[in-house]
Amino acid sequence: RDDVESRGLGDVYKRQCQNNETLHNLMIEIAPLSVSRVFLFKEQTYRGRCLVAYKDHVNDLFELSDEERNAFMADVARVTRAMDKAFHPEKINYGAYSDKLSHLHFHLAPKYVDGPDYGGVFQMNPGKVYLTDAEYQEMIEAIKKNL
């Protein structure tokens, strides 16, 4: 991270990571958290699926100080707790894939008994379930209420 900042690229990366068109096509921002932002994934095969992205541009957990990492993981836990209260899944799966998007983020995919891929790995973007704006808003409010 220091290398990115020293080359004067921090603001460029921040703008690209936080506000790019791809992000807005895939997700809806729910709220800023202490060191991250939480988004509702638009594709809702896994009802309540969210993504938590670190607020600054970093590629991996090891780039964070212990304090930053602990704060980020506290944000992730805060979101999963809210998801659990709002949607009552059997389990929440965590995914930290950064092959194509080099920015620290966690996918949080609720899993339900008899639901898609229960007992297996969740699909990144199955492209099966999209909701109305009102349904997205209802989910966002349920998560916010429990954050």
Model regions: which residues?
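Catalytic strand-loop segment that frames the active site of acyl-thioester-processing enzymes
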Residues: 40-58
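Single conserved hydrophobic/aromatic residue that forms the stacking wall/gate
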Residues: 1-13
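Short histidine-centered catalytic/ligand-binding loop motif
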Residues: 55-73, 124-132
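Divalent metal-coordination and catalytic microenvironments
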Residues: 38, 54, 72, 106
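Short beta-strand/loop segment at the start of cytosolic alpha/beta domains
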Residues: 28-45
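Histidine-centered divalent-metal-coordination microenvironment in nucleic-acid enzymes
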Residues: 91, 100-123
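C-terminal helix-cap and adjacent tail motif
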Residues: 7, 15, 112-147
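Long, well-ordered alpha-helical scaffolding segments within enzyme catalytic domains
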Residues: 68-85, 137-140
